Amino acid sequence: MRIKSILLSLSAVVALSAGVANAATNLVTNGNFSDTSQGGNKQLAYTTNNIEANRTTLDGWTSSNRNDRYNFVLDTAIANTDKSVKWMKTSIAGGLGQGNVFASDSQYLPGTLSQNITGLTAGGLYTLTFDFALAQQVGFNGVNNDNFWQVGFGDVNPTQNSALLSIANGGFSGWKTATMTFAATSTSQVLSFLAQGTGPGAPPFLLLDNVSLISAVPEPSTWGMMLGGLGLVGFLARRRRAAKLA
């Protein structure tokens, strides 16, 4: 009976720790690109002022490049149809990529997508995760090799690259998940994504979704809850031992 009680208590601690971990605050605003100024399925504007009807912006994000040309918000539900602002040859919907996704052509005036992240602790480590994929536009042919997202976080940290994605003519890479760790050097830093590729290919569109940045080290409150749970297990064990000796 004593062992069963301790095991139940341990299970409670594990569940508590997992719940706290899952509740870690995502410091990225609009990481799934669902919030836009003028709807999805449009080309991104480089400014929030006087936006044309066929342009949109992503809440929390800035799209920067010459004449705001080849950065887009695509709707995965229609991306492989002629209703899409950029018609992909295959479906890009999947378990990871759903709804709005950010799309950029690495070979034709790609623009940096960036967001200023606040609430950081200088010297703290942060884990960045995001989902990404590679697809090809209708009307073009050719192999697309070695495309990747170049990720920056502040002016001091070196950039990091996602895994290379390559597809055959008309192919789709499927959705992948990238995980990176960065150190904060100040209380606010700019997180940025830039589509890159080593070969011209034929309109390779890199896709991005579900961007998340969380502290890599549990906050003091998290440690307190975990230690409190472990203390409870110890207390129950001592109480049962004392009851048995009495």
Name the predicted role of every residue range.
Residues 24-121, 131, 135, 141-149, ...:
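Aromatic (Trp/Tyr/Phe) and Gly/Pro-enriched flexible surface segments
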Residues 151-155:
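Conserved aromatic beta-strand anchor motif in extracellular beta-sandwich/beta-rich domains
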Residues 235-246:
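C-terminal membrane-anchoring or membrane-association module
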Residues 1-9, 242-244:
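Bacterial Sec-dependent N-terminal signal peptides
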Residues 189-193:
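Short, well-structured beta-strand segments within conserved domains
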Residues 119-129, 186-188:
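Extended extracellular/luminal ectodomain segments enriched in beta-structured repeat modules
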Residues 7, 12-25, 204-235:
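Short, threonine-centered small-residue motifs that mark membrane-proximal processing/anchoring sites
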